[in-house]
């Protein structure tokens, strides 16, 4: 740390959201752990608050129904934090503010940071953040920062104009660097703010990103008190499922606690697929295998039994993946793990080593069953390759998860039919599906090389005129550019085709596996069953999972889900941004307004 900069006290908060994931027991958030690690290494004190867990475990029950209604009221919350609420209403919000601070056990801090990772356009997330930020400014005179690289700067301008309790908004790719510069700024030291919107002298100012990226994948610093809350024995795990059967009772031993945490060793990707925003010209941020083993060993020593890798892929580099597996086996890490796997860099030998090194579930980007489309998007695999390795992975006992995309540019009825046939051919080897309608992302190869792929992007008006927070519950970071197929479908026609393709593939998944198999990973359940029964009993594990997941209780619900007929609705997603002039923040269009989808 710069010797001129005094040590500050910084609190980092992961806020609650209603519709983030539906796991009965999710892993802890990695973002605040990464930021905390960087701050501690620079000599500051960092405190982590898992407000997501605090809210669903206890805080929500400390509020009356009227107080909960006020917390969800976007207009009243906005008036309160802007000092425009009527006196009687302000008193009510003061009480809520006190309940939140006490429930979260927020300490006096110089800076309070709230991550917006996974943000959806929902009142709970945004109002919670605004009320907490307002509270710490009132109680501690603290500065506040919100941040997430998935939200463009225009989104931060929008939020910070509505809520003056936010002092900084970080959209930089390298969040650790950005928050350290903010620390310098509030310390009165020279600061090179980067990828940050800052409130200066009552006005908002943008400090563009400098393009800097972290040299290596981030290292999380999880606090013990948070890890303790994510430990679960088999009894707790089974209690969230359809487990009132003799076989389940026989499996419960209460002799071990399970703990899954996120971790990454490579976020960059050498692939050149047209779909994602990856820039394969970037230098790899992969850690050395020795560093990975060292960091995983330290996590194990703290009670971690499973790793939820958030890499771009476990095996982007064959030799490195093989070396890592060999070391995981040699040093007897005995960690169960989950990760994405690259079909381009795969063979049976590597799959065997991944299994021996602890792989429980692998996610494969199959994308489509049309060889024409696989070639078109430069996926680098064949339909037969995907089938071959899915079959072998299943044979050796790995839980297979595939990702599919509906509505690629130029996709036609023959391509959809090929995908449906392929799904029939691999259904016996697949356990979980993820299905997404096609999004044309800014900075993807589709965007950068439009002529090559036979499309033409229809430009948006400037993003400052678009509503990032409409409709209600949209995933804020996910939006598609509109495009036309050159010599083919117009945007309106293509949009309808994407929706139709999504419906067709979703119906196929429902027919062969039911909607229960879409998206629900059941990390703790899988880790527990594989720990007890082993890879050699996958068929038994599959039967048990099918029975146990007939109903289950997500961590953020007070009831068991048992009707999954409407659980998949991505075909209804509004993938594009709508103009501010026609839409309400966190709501429906203005009365009488007709959003112009042809923009």
State where each predicted segment sits.
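Radical SAM [4Fe-4S] cluster-binding motif and immediate context
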Residues: 225-400, 421
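Flexible glycine/acidic-rich beta-alpha junction loops that bind and position SAM and/or redox cofactors
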Residues: 19-22, 54-59, 151-157, 271, ...
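N-terminal [4Fe-4S]-dependent radical SAM core
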Residues: 2-4, 8, 19, 202-262, ...
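Radical SAM enzyme core and accessory elements
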Residues: 1-13, 19-22, 41-45, 101-110, ...
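Glycine-rich, highly charged phosphate/nucleotide-binding loops
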Residues: 69-104
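Structural recognition of alpha->loop->beta junctions
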Residues: 158-180, 353-362, 418-440
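Glycine-rich beta-alpha loop elements in corrinoid/cobalamin-binding modules
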Residues: 31, 35-38, 45-51, 91-218
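Glycine- and acidic-residue-enriched helix-capping/strand-helix junction motifs
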Residues: 20-32
């Amino acid at each position: 740390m710069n010797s001129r900069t005094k040590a500050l006290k910084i609190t980092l908060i992961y806020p609650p959201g209603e519709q983030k994931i539906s796991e009965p027991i999710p892993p802890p958030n990695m973002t605040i752990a990464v930021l905390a690690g960087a701050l501690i290494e620079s000599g500051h004190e960092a405190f982590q608050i898992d407000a997501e867990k605090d809210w669903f475990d206890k805080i929500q029950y400390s509020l009356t129904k009227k107080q909960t209604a006020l917390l969800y009221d976007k207009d009243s919350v906005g008036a309160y934090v802007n000092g425009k609420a009527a006196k009687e209403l302000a008193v009510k919000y003061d009480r809520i503010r006190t309940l939140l601070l006490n429930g979260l056990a927020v300490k006096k801090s110089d800076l309070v940071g709230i991550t917006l990772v996974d943000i959806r356009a929902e009142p709970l997330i945004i109002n919670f953040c605004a009320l907490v930020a307002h509270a710490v400014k009132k109680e501690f005179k603290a500065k506040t920062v919100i941040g997430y690289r998935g939200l463009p700067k225009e989104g931060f301008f929008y939020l910070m104009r509505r809520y003056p309790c936010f002092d900084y908004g970080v959209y930089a790719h390298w969040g650790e660097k950005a928050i350290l510069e903010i620390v310098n700024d509030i310390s009165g030291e020279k600061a090179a703010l980067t990828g940050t919107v800052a409130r200066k002298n009552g006005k908002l100012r943008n400090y563009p990103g400098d393009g800097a990226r972290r040299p290596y994948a981030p290292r999380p610093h999880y606090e013990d008190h948070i890890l303790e809350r994510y430990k679960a024995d088999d009894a707790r795990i089974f209690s969230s499922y359809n487990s009132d059967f003799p076989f389940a009772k026989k499996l419960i031993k209460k002799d071990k606690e399970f703990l899954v945490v996120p971790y990454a060793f490579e976020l960059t990707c050498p692939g050149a697929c047209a779909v994602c925003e990856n820039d394969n010209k970037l230098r790899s941020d992969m850690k050395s295998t020795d560093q990975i083993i060292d960091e995983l060993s330290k996590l194990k020593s703290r009670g971690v039994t499973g790793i939820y890798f958030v890499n771009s892929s476990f095996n982007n580099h064959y030799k490195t993946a093989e070396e890592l597996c060999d070391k995981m086996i040699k040093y007897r890490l005995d960690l169960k793990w989950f990760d994405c796997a690259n079909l381009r860099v795969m063979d049976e030998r590597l799959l065997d080593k991944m299994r021996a090194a602890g792989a429980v579930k692998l996610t494969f980007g199959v994308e489509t069953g049309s060889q024409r489309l696989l070639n078109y998007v430069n996926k680098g695999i064949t339909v037969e390759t995907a089938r071959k390795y899915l079959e072998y992975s299943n044979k050796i006992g790995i839980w297979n998860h595939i990702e599919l995309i509906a509505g690629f540019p130029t996709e036609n009825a023959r391509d959809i039919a090929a995908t449906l046939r392929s799904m029939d051919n691999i259904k016996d080897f697949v356990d979980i599906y993820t299905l997404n309608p096609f999004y044309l992302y800014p900075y993807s190869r589709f965007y950068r090389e439009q002529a090559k792929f036979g499309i033409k992007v229809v430009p948006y008006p400037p993003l400052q005129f678009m509503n990032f927070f409409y409709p209600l519950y949209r995933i804020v970071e996910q939006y598609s550019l509109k495009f036309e197929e050159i010599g083919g479908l117009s945007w309106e026609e293509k949009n309808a085709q994407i929706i139709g393709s999504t419906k067709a593939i979703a119906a196929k998944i429902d027919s062969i596996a039911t909607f229960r198999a879409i998206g629900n990973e059941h990390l703790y359940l899988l880790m527990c069953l594989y720990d007890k029964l082993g890879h050699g009993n996958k068929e038994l594990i599959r039967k048990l999972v099918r029975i146990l997941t007939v109903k289950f209780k997500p961590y953020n619900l007070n009831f068991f889900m048992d009707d999954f007929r409407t659980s998949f609705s991505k075909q209804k997603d509004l993938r594009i941004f709508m103009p501010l002039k026609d839409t309400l923040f966190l709501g429906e269009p203005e009365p009488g307004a007709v959003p112009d989808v042809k923009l």
